[in-house]
Curated annotation (Swiss-Prot):
Aminoacyl-tRNA synthetase keyword on record: no
Signal peptide positions (record): 1-22
The species this protein was found in: Homo sapiens
Coiled coil regions, renumbered to chain: none
Subcellular location field: Secreted
MF annotations from Gene Ontology: serine-type endopeptidase inhibitor activity
Listed transmembrane segments: none
A single BP term in Gene Ontology: innate immune response
Gene Ontology CC terms: extracellular space
Protein name per Swiss-Prot or TrEMBL: WAP four-disulfide core domain protein 13
Primary localization: secreted
Gene this protein is translated from: WFDC13
Role according to the record: Putative acid-stable proteinase inhibitor.
Domain named WAP: residues: 24-73
Disulphides: C45-C66, C49-C61, C55-C70
Amino acid sequence: MKPVLPLQFLVVFCLALQLVPGSPKQRVLKYILEPPPCISAPENCTHLCTMQEDCEKGFQCCSSFCGIVCSSETFQKRNRIKHKGSEVIMPAN
């Protein structure tokens, strides 16, 4: 085995690690600390939460346009309205 081969492997390995932004610890902490996006539009943006235990039964702590709030766990069906040249998605009532 040539002595150049391990050196080439080491250089490629170091360059590949630089392409990945952030450390694995930061990515894991971000996933744990930030709640998932809401699956339905929040009914009330005043019920803020920091943990799942802050929400009542049937609600989940999630991230929405108005912050981290308690939102319904059920998926909200949306109606599709077609217009000329575009499509608009509206919440179902």
